Amino acid sequence: MNPFKQELIKAEKKAEKLFKEIEIQGLLIPGITEKELNASIFNLAFELFSIEKYWHKRIVRAGKNTLKPYDENPENLTLKPDDILFIDFGPIFEEWEADFGRTYVLGNDMLKKKLALDIEHAWWAGKAYFDKHKKITGAELYAYCNTLAQKYQWEFGGEIGGHLIGHFPHERLEKEDKTNYIHPENKVDMRALDQKGEERNWILEIHFVDKEKEIGGFFEQLLTI
């Protein structure tokens, strides 16, 4: 394994530890707002790893806001006792980027719990599909993620199914260049080398929603390991 990928894996392991600590510290409680939870996680990340830099905006979304994709900036909701919420943070550990997303269910709603399980199972199914196909475009993987949503009886909620990840500061991911994303217009092999002749690394993100019930779930981590 090349040193570049090893650093990305180390960064992700730290992100995973941060997310576990969120639960251990009891930060996920009803009655607080999304912004308050966001600030608490920011403070926890600083205490654990001295993190102050994030390569994308920090996302905490609860209730109907879990329907919203990354680009939107919905109203600040208060967490309810039976809520579903997801957290999507992109912390930078010693100049290496992580991008980690998880979903949590505060109450005992079985449909919400099913959604939280389904997105994790779908993520691993997506990785297995990627690993099986030694040549695969972003469009092909995105289409498969949509097929998984149908299999689990949800709707795929994102315009993308993932993106490139790397060393900070990396070249900005231009939204107009779909080859940077797991996107229906990306016809390039995801395993193609970059302009420097180096391997590219990808994040896979699964966002399933039920628009009628106004719930969504999100699961995200490093794909190319």
Predicted features along the sequence, with ranges:
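Active-site neighborhoods and metal-handling regions in enzymes and metal-associated proteins
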Residues: 1-225
